[in-house]
Amino acid sequence: MLRLLRPLLLLLLLPPPGSPEPPGLTQLSPGAPPQAPDLLYADGLRAYAAGAWAPAVALLREALRSQAALGRVRLDCGASCAADPGAALPAVLLGAPEPDSGPGPTQGSWERQLLRAALRRADCLTQCAARRLGPGGAARLRVGSALRDAFRRREPYNYLQRAYYQLKKLDLAAAAAHTFFVANPMHLQMREDMAKYRRMSGVRPQSFRDLETPPHWAAYDTGLELLGRQEAGLALPRLEEALQGSLAQMESCRADCEGPEEQQGAEEEEDGAASQGGLYEAIAGHWIQVLQCRQRCVGETATRPGRSFPVPDFLPNQLRRLHEAHAQVGNLSQAIENVLSVLLFYPEDEAAKRALNQYQAQLGEPRPGLGPREDIQRFILRSLGEKRQLYYAMEHLGTSFKDPDPWTPAALIPEALREKLREDQEKRPWDHEPVKPKPLTYWKDVLLLEGVTLTQDSRQLNGSERAVLDGLLTPAECGVLLQLAKDAAGAGARSGYRGRRSPHTPHERFEGLTVLKAAQLARAGTVGSQGAKLLLEVSERVRTLTQAYFSPERPLHLSFTHLVCRSAIEGEQEQRMDLSHPVHADNCVLDPDTGECWREPPAYTYRDYSGLLYLNDDFQGGDLFFTEPNALTVTARVRPRCGRLVAFSSGVENPHGVWAVTRGRRCALALWHTWAPEHREQEWIEAKELLQESQEEEEEEEEEMPSKDPSPEPPSRRHQRVQDKTGRAPRVREEL
């Protein structure tokens, strides 16, 4: 009965129609004990599927609130019980395991201490959970791994944005969509939804806010922004807040590590930490899992939502910014505390040592009690103690441990393990540096395609991972592809494909054609099949060469192929000062002011290599150019011509743009490649299958007798059959 009434009860908690919605997803029933998140989430999805948007919002929000409340209970109970003297672990167990001293009173003593402390800690945690969650609440509200993963991926917000949209709450719909997208930047449907929200009149730029941003990231970004404006005094409170928030976030993560053993991931079971044998093996196995999880909290705290990798040296770098900012405003004592804390991580850091000497000289007489920060000292001592135990288990029990910290002293690692760890690191060279291309003299002799020559390498292009190759297309092949682009543009009114003004400049017209669209037009008889087939063949030709040159030991996959033409608009070229395509990088958002490139949306972060295969040169302007990360200093310039390929890595090392096309029409095949097979271009596969089907049908028709029907099927009907066969109407994907 209670489960049937839950949607109605939660519906009453929603604000009345027309009332202002509070910013963010605030608590629906403050002070109330959390309910079972899994039941709330399941009920919310049922309401969503039934189109009951208001109950769906209430249930999904309450599921989020309850999940967060459970996390706070674990954190609070863990902290209070850890502070209980009667439940403290024996001091002898907090450091490295000592060699067995043999049977006797000493061994029995620590065993009794351990078990007594474990029992008291368990009793304390049970009583605390009962007070906060009710009797048996910890077991009743336990969440399975599948649901934890769904909440970590922020899936409730995917449903919330749709429900809010149906309720006409566009501000919250955009916020929920943005919150989901931040953690799932590769979600193509949400990328399209975000673009739609941006075009809606009722949505403001402020609507796109992350409702789940960890507080330490918000403070960190604000502090960096203020430092960039030379406002150290205003930045200091935000930087300190970021550091304290980072430490608090790690404590929350560590509390989650102490859940039931079944909640630990399968990763630990594979590395030998799973429970085997008797009592002590079981205790050791679970304890190792907890320690491994705690050590991973450093990387999780340093990883932005939606990012794959943590910010390197996150805590030490925060301390570096703090001591520099304190010094700028004259807080020398605090500057010394923070620089001494940096030296706890890196005792031989020359820059930190120079800064310390400078601060001490400016301060004058040494002040008693001035040392590293106590919170950082506690963090390092605890982390080193855990590492010591994990390396011991690695050496003696055969478990594995991936140390997340570059500052771990080498002396802490057992000598027997150092060589093995060094070998493991050397087995994966691409994790540390890109594959180096072969020298120019090698490529002049062994290029894969006859007639292809390497014209310029990275050295001649004044950069890294760049190359210009000529001869990939014959003049006849360039003509076929140019005709394909022209025919597709001419068929725009019938197919939904039409040119438009360039999104980068009002002085040019932009036309784009994907491989799938070309295949569909060829199947419909709108364009010739020769051009569509050549488009597929040439894209694979470019992929093969790019992989052979830049990544011979790691397969590359096409992620997107686009035939693009830019045409100068007559009468709009006088005194033109803009570019055809502004300077950018292909897999990160370039910040010319700082020279940094953020690998995050809206950039296509999975792109690893880019290629531009030119089809003509009978136009004015339109040269490709590379720059420094400041987007101002030009380092190389490439003039398009038929069959010329410019290939380069897609990151910050290769910012590039296109000079204005001031006369004529410039056409090129743009291709992007990825190491990630899950991001390979599915439309390329569909296009290939579609063209193969067309060829088979043509061959069958040739074998049959000529039909007496004087009225063959019109192209529009044939086009409709293509749509039906693929299961959906063909769509044009625009990508610049």
UniProtKB/Swiss-Prot annotation:
Subunit details: Identified in a complex with PLOD1 and P3H4.
Cofactor(s) needed for function: Fe cation; L-ascorbate
UniProt-recorded name of the protein: Prolyl 3-hydroxylase 3
Stretches assigned to the Fe2OG dioxygenase domain: 561-675
Stretches forming TPR repeats: 37-70, 154-187, 216-249, 316-349
Family: Belongs to the leprecan family.
Source species of the chain: Homo sapiens
Upper lineage: Eukaryota, Metazoa, Chordata, Craniata, Vertebrata
InterPro entries with a match to the protein in the record: Leprecan_dom, Oxoglu/Fe-dep_dioxygenase_dom, P3H, Pro_4_hyd_alph, Pro_4_hyd_alph_FE2OG_OXY, TPR-like_helical_dom_sf
